[in-house]
Protein backbone atom coordinates (compact mmCIF):
# COMPACT_ATOMS: atom_id res chain seq x y z
CA UNK A 1 0.00 0.00 0.00
CA UNK A 2 1.47 3.32 -1.11
CA UNK A 3 0.22 6.34 0.79
CA UNK A 4 1.64 9.10 -1.39
CA UNK A 5 1.81 7.65 -4.87
CA UNK A 6 1.44 10.91 -6.76
CA UNK A 7 3.58 13.28 -4.71
CA UNK A 8 5.02 14.96 -7.81
CA UNK A 9 1.57 15.76 -9.18
CA UNK A 10 0.34 17.01 -5.82
CA UNK A 11 3.39 19.17 -5.08
CA UNK A 12 3.26 20.85 -8.50
CA UNK A 13 -0.43 21.60 -8.12
CA UNK A 14 -0.87 24.63 -5.88
CA UNK A 15 -4.59 25.06 -6.40
CA UNK A 16 -6.15 22.40 -4.20
CA UNK A 17 -9.62 23.15 -5.51
CA UNK A 18 -8.76 22.33 -9.10
CA UNK A 19 -10.38 19.38 -10.79
CA UNK A 20 -7.04 17.66 -11.39
CA UNK A 21 -6.02 17.84 -7.73
CA UNK A 22 -9.40 16.50 -6.60
CA UNK A 23 -9.23 13.60 -9.07
CA UNK A 24 -5.69 12.73 -7.93
CA UNK A 25 -6.71 12.76 -4.26
CA UNK A 26 -9.80 10.64 -4.99
CA UNK A 27 -7.64 8.19 -6.95
CA UNK A 28 -5.26 7.86 -3.99
CA UNK A 29 -8.21 7.21 -1.67
CA UNK A 30 -9.64 4.64 -4.10
CA UNK A 31 -6.36 2.75 -4.31
CA UNK A 32 -6.00 2.73 -0.51
CA UNK A 33 -9.56 1.46 -0.06
CA UNK A 34 -9.19 -1.28 -2.68
CA UNK A 35 -6.04 -2.58 -0.99
CA UNK A 36 -7.89 -2.47 2.35
CA UNK A 37 -10.86 -4.36 0.91
CA UNK A 38 -8.63 -7.12 -0.46
CA UNK A 39 -7.90 -8.12 3.15
CA UNK A 40 -11.25 -7.19 4.70
CA UNK A 41 -13.85 -8.43 2.25
CA UNK A 42 -16.83 -8.01 4.57
CA UNK A 43 -16.19 -4.38 5.44
CA UNK A 44 -19.40 -3.10 3.91
CA UNK A 45 -19.06 0.47 5.16
CA UNK A 46 -15.75 0.80 3.36
CA UNK A 47 -17.35 -0.69 0.24
CA UNK A 48 -20.04 1.98 0.37
CA UNK A 49 -17.46 4.70 0.85
CA UNK A 50 -15.51 3.36 -2.12
CA UNK A 51 -18.61 3.48 -4.32
CA UNK A 52 -19.31 7.07 -3.25
CA UNK A 53 -15.75 8.17 -4.03
CA UNK A 54 -15.88 6.39 -7.39
CA UNK A 55 -19.04 8.30 -8.26
CA UNK A 56 -17.50 11.63 -7.26
CA UNK A 57 -14.41 10.94 -9.36
CA UNK A 58 -16.55 9.90 -12.31
CA UNK A 59 -18.56 13.13 -12.14
CA UNK A 60 -15.39 15.23 -11.96
CA UNK A 61 -13.84 13.37 -14.89
CA UNK A 62 -16.95 13.82 -17.02
CA UNK A 63 -16.95 17.55 -16.20
CA UNK A 64 -13.28 17.82 -17.16
CA UNK A 65 -13.80 15.90 -20.41
CA UNK A 66 -16.57 18.30 -21.41
CA UNK A 67 -14.63 21.45 -20.48
CA UNK A 68 -11.07 20.63 -21.56
CA UNK A 69 -10.39 17.40 -23.44
CA UNK A 70 -6.60 17.91 -23.53
CA UNK A 71 -6.25 18.20 -19.75
CA UNK A 72 -8.58 15.21 -19.39
CA UNK A 73 -6.47 12.94 -21.60
CA UNK A 74 -3.25 14.05 -19.86
CA UNK A 75 -4.73 13.32 -16.44
CA UNK A 76 -6.06 9.92 -17.53
CA UNK A 77 -2.66 8.91 -18.88
CA UNK A 78 -0.83 10.16 -15.75
CA UNK A 79 -3.09 8.30 -13.34
CA UNK A 80 -3.29 5.18 -15.51
CA UNK A 81 -7.08 4.90 -15.27
CA UNK A 82 -9.58 3.99 -17.96
CA UNK A 83 -11.36 6.55 -20.07
CA UNK A 84 -15.01 7.23 -19.33
CA UNK A 85 -17.55 5.25 -21.29
CA UNK A 86 -20.50 7.19 -22.59
CA UNK A 87 -23.96 5.75 -22.84
From Swiss-Prot:
Organism domain of life: Eukaryota
Pfam families tied to this protein: Ribosomal_S15
Keyword Iron-sulfur: no
GO molecular function terms noted in the UniProt entry: structural constituent of ribosome
Database matches in InterPro entries: Ribosomal_uS15, Ribosomal_uS15_bac-type, uS15_NS1_RNA-bd_sf
Keyword Lyase on entry: no
UniProt keywords, alphabetically: Chloroplast, Plastid, Ribonucleoprotein, Ribosomal protein
Localization, UniProt: Plastid, Chloroplast
Stated family: Belongs to the universal ribosomal protein uS15 family.
Subunit structure: Part of the 30S ribosomal subunit.
Stated name of the protein: Small ribosomal subunit protein uS15c
Organism: Oenothera biennis (German evening primrose)
Amino acid sequence: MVKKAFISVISQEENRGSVEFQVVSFTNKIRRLTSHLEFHRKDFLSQRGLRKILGKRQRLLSYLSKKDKVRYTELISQLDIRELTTR
